[in-house]
Design a protein with these regions (language model features):
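Acidic, serine/proline-rich low-complexity intrinsically disordered regions
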Residues: 4-267
Length: 267
């Protein structure tokens, strides 16, 4: 049994609820200078996946190595440090998130996907104010996720990201992945409010420390639940965002809690 499976089993046993299962995703970052193990490379998707899709699929037993070649969300590519936030070239022709834009734009082959810089400058999230309705997700009536470009840029300043980019790949995998015993950097649990209460109680029992949640309405899986715990070394709690609900189909009664592996070990 792998290390994370042992720790997960201990957590579930401590909950004392018969047949309880809490969806869990383990996350491992590989930097540009790292050698990615063969069994991990074997789980590199040949189609694009958003980070929230990869996280959801991992919680169901799958695994996915996300790289610049297959990540389906430009925002997540920025957050994970796979690309520079000011890159002016689009990631590629077909990505899950930008394909939605292409479909609603009606432009077909004439559609040009937004670049990382378009996201950084607020042109995507404030598509109406920036005059870029091609970047809308919900047709002509879509005003974007923020009222104007300045508000979008302000919000993005608080969305933690690994910048400048230093990441070669991000591996999201299930507790059942046992080709090799990988120690993850971050653990994400998809919890009900009652399960969240028990986990916070367990953390406080050992540390006496309160948990402060920092959350936004976008980039919740990649930024709030994965990169924020990775960079701060602290737990974070956040509800799943629009993309996670619509694209990855996270359940309405669940939210996420992300934590460094070192904290998960002590629960």
């Amino acid at each position: 049994m792998t290390t994370i499976n042992q720790l997960y089993s201990r957590l579930i046993s401590a909950m004392g609820v018969e047949d309880l299962e809490i969806p869990m995703t383990a996350v491992k970052f590989y930097k540009k200078e790292d050698e990615i193990p063969g069994p991990v490379k074997e789980n590199q998707p040949t189609i694009s996946l958003t980070s929230c899709q990869a996280a959801k699929q991992a919680s169901l037993g799958d695994a996915a190595l996300l790289t610049t070649d297959n990540i389906g969300c430009v925002a997540a590519a920025i957050t994970f440090g796979l690309v520079d936030k000011d890159q002016t070239e689009p990631l590629g022709d077909s990505r899950v998130y930008t394909d939605i834009m292409r479909d609603q734009s009606g432009l077909g082959d004439d559609f040009k996907p937004p670049s990382p810089k378009d996201f950084t400058e607020g042109n995507v999230y404030a598509c109406k104010d920036s005059g870029n309705m091609d970047f809308a997700l919900f047709g002509k009536e879509d005003v974007g996720r923020f009222k104007d470009v300045e508000t979008a840029k302000k919000a993005m300043k608080d969305m933690m990201a690994i910048q400048p980019p230093t990441t070669k790949g991000v591996f999201l995998y299930s507790r059942d992945f046992d080709d090799i015993d990988i120690i993850p950097d971050v653990i994400v649990l998809s919890v009900t409010s009652a399960e969240l209460t028990r986990i916070i109680q367990a953390y406080q029992f050992n540390t006496g420390e309160r948990v402060t949640a920092s959350m936004g309405g976008l980039r919740v899986v990649n930024s709030d639940l994965i990169v924020r715990p990775y960079l701060t070394g602290k737990i974070n709690v956040a509800p799943y965002c629009l993309g996670a609900r619509l694209i990855a189909e996270f359940e309405a009664d669940r939210m996420g809690i992300g934590m460094p592996f070192s904290i998960f070990e002590e629960l």
